[in-house]
């Protein structure tokens, strides 16, 4: 998987982010010098976790023949500060008709989403500069 970010204008921090054939606008709030034309990068991290969790649950439920219409995943992301680790508060709002065993199984499945696993695991960075 590959993603690229390129600045769109000379005002603010608005960037067009490309992933495959998809484009998303990412920016910073006006209070941080941006133009607030899109989510900021940290919000995109929360978006990635919320959407990955929802899709993982829905894929599993579909294979099982379970109806999860109305499923909603809310993620609140608190960046690390001195002495406090990064925190993700993830709330899975599931349809009331699901049984207790189904809900417990879906909670286990939710933690298996690729973004969740990436955030839980070790991450290595290979950083370099290329002159253009």
Regions found by a protein language model. Name each.
Residues 1-47, 55-132:
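Extended beta-strand/beta-hairpin segments
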């Amino acid at each position: 998987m590959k993603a690229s970010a390129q600045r769109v204008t000379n005002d603010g921090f608005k960037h067009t982010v490309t992933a495959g054939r998809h484009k998303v606008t990412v920016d910073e709030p006006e209070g941080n010098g941006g133009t607030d034309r899109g989510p900021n990068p940290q919000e995109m991290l929360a978006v990635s976790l919320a959407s990955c969790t929802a899709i993982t649950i829905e894929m599993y439920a579909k294979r099982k023949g379970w109806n999860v219409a109305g499923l909603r995943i809310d993620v609140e992301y608190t960046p690390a500060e001195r002495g406090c680790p990064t925190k993700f508060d993830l709330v899975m709002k599931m349809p009331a008709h699901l049984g207790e065993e189904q809900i417990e199984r879906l909670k286990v499945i939710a933690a298996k989403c690729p973004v969740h696993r990436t955030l839980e695991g070790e991450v290595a960075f290979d950083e370099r500069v290329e002159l253009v």
